């Protein structure tokens, strides 16, 4: 299965294992709760999906890379204990609590949550001395004398032997006690993820145009060559950072992430071409309404004269800008909702604003440590606290530092904050109303419009906006394309009927 399907399998398993009856007992017997083993090539996102499930299901995640551990850190250190058996006194060996099990209990104490995910990466590459211990854990959910608490799902990950010489095979006894989930590198799943994650438009466009370039691992007599999903995503982040700083991107930089010369050179050429199209067409100016009639007419002629690659890139440039607008609206909307909820929580409590903000920051620290929320969510939450803190300082300067006066002051500031959200709504609506007519003028209702509507429909951010605020341009385009599809289907039925006669 692809990485997104594997993510849903983890989510569904977590929910099934944690389901409880009317008495609060787990419906799924603990002895039947098999650990999940994600087995797939490196860099496809196995670790990332486990982190995402933990955040989305609001459970703590304890993660360990097993190649960094010895038998002592997994099982615990030996200690001498005194025992009496059958009237005789003995000195016996016991073990301290496993570091891994200890981390699980710490997560439970720090978060106040009794259920979570224990993720063990590179599990089939452990040392020879640790291998029997790991097999015992997968079979019995115990390290030494200490068992994993109830309510914790074990997810392990590893690479097949062809990708790692250090791999150890599991025996049939272990395999019969786990759920082996093979994970494949999927270009389509990556594009879906990348569009929502805000990856660089050149990468999304290139991989949509050349899906065979998405993933590659090979070895020759000189070196190992590889191109992975992780490499594409990390390259995307650096490209965006370099562009924001005005730093030129060289071909050697691309090769640091795409370790296959043919692919790195080919993508670098496309990246430069994509950038030149972006500058030549002025997509940002078109969607922002800053282009005059002569400018639009010139770009229309340019697009109509372009080859398939140029047209494909133009549509993707427009989609990239639309995704930026949708993301900006989504951030503003989420900010306003979270800001309102945080302020309401403060109004309900009787303490000072300073104590409230300190408690919230402590809670954020716990969420950060156990990955209960994404880095972006935590950054946004910290930004909300800083904003309320700033408003609190302004309230003191206005002699409205506490009580009902402070509440009125904060509510007034919040009302002003909502205007920024309205600006993002107007921006997104206008961009859709300009993008669709522009491409229609350029290409009619051709394949370019189908590509545009597919990109919009496949974007959760844009569809969430349209579902909430509507878009006459989008709905009209959908109607036209659906009519064309129905007409084509009717013509095909007529043709078949004539052929039968």
Task: Go through the PLM ranges and name each one.
Residues 1-212, 217-220:
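AAA+ P-loop NTPase catalytic core and its hallmark functional loops
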Residues 5, 9, 99, 103, ...:
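Exposed alpha-helical structural elements
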Residues 98, 149, 171, 200, ...:
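Alpha-helix initiation/capping motif
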Residues 196-358:
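Alpha-helical lid/collar subdomain of P-loop NTPases
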């Amino acid at each position: 299965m692809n990485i997104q399907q594997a993510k849903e399998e983890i989510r569904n398993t977590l929910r099934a294992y944690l389901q409880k009856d009317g008495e609060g007992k787990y419906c799924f017997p603990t002895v039947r709760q098999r650990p999940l083993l994600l087995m797939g090539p490196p860099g496809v996102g196995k670790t990332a999906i486990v982190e995402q499930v933990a955040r989305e299901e609001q459970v703590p995640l304890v993660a360990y890379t097993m190649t960094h551990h010895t038998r002592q850190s997994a099982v615990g250190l030996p200690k001498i204990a005194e025992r009496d058996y059958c009237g005789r006194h003995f000195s016996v060996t016991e073990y301290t609590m496993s570091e891994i099990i200890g981390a699980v209990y710490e997560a439970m104490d720090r978060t106040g949550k009794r259920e979570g995910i224990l993720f063990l990466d590179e599990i089939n590459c452990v040392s020879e001395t640790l291998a029997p211990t790991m097999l015992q854990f997968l079979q019995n959910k115990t390290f030494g004398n200490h068992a994993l608490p109830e309510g914790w799902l074990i997810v392990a990950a590893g690479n097949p032997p062809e990708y790692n010489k250090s791999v150890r095979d599991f025996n049939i006894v272990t395999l019969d006690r786990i759920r082996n989930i093979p994970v494949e590198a999927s270009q389509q799943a990556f594009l879906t993820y990348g569009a929502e994650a805000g990856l660089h438009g050149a990468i999304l466009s290139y991989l949509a145009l050349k899906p065979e370039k998405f993933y590659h691992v090979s070895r020759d007599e000189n070196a190992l060559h590889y191109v992975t999903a992780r490499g594409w995503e990390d390259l995307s982040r650096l490209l965006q950072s370099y562009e924001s700083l005005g730093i030129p991107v060289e071909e050697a930089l691309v090769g640091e992430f795409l370790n296959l010369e043919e692919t790195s050179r080919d993508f670098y050429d496309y990246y430069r071409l994509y950038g030149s199209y972006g500058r030549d067409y002025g997509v940002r100016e078109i969607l922002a309404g800053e282009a005059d009639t002569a400018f639009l007419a010139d770009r229309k002629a340019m697009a109509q004269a372009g080859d398939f690659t140029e047209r494909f890139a133009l549509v993707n440039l427009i989609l990239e800008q639309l995704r930026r607008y949708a993301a900006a609206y989504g951030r503003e909307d989420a900010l306003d909702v979270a800001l309102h909820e945080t302020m309401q929580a403060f109004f309900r409590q009787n303490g000072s604003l300073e104590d409230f903000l300190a408690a919230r920051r402590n809670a954020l620290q716990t969420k950060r440590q156990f990955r209960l929320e994404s880095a972006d969510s935590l950054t946004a939450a910290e930004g909300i606290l800083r904003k309320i803190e700033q408003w609190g300082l302004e309230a003191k300067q206005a002699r409205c530092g506490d009580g009902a006066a402070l509440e009125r002051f904060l509510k007034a500031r919040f009302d002003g904050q909502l205007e920024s959200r309205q600006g993002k709504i107007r921006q997104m609506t206008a961009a859709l109303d300009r993008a669709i007519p522009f491409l229609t003028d350029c290409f009619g209702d051709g394949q370019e419009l189908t590509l545009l509507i597919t990109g919009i429909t496949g974007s959760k951010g844009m569809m969430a906006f349209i579902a909430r605020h509507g878009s006459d341009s989008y709905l009209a385009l959908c109607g036209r394309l659906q009519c064309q599809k129905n007409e084509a289907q009717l013509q095909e039925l007529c043709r078949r009927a004539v052929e039968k006669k």
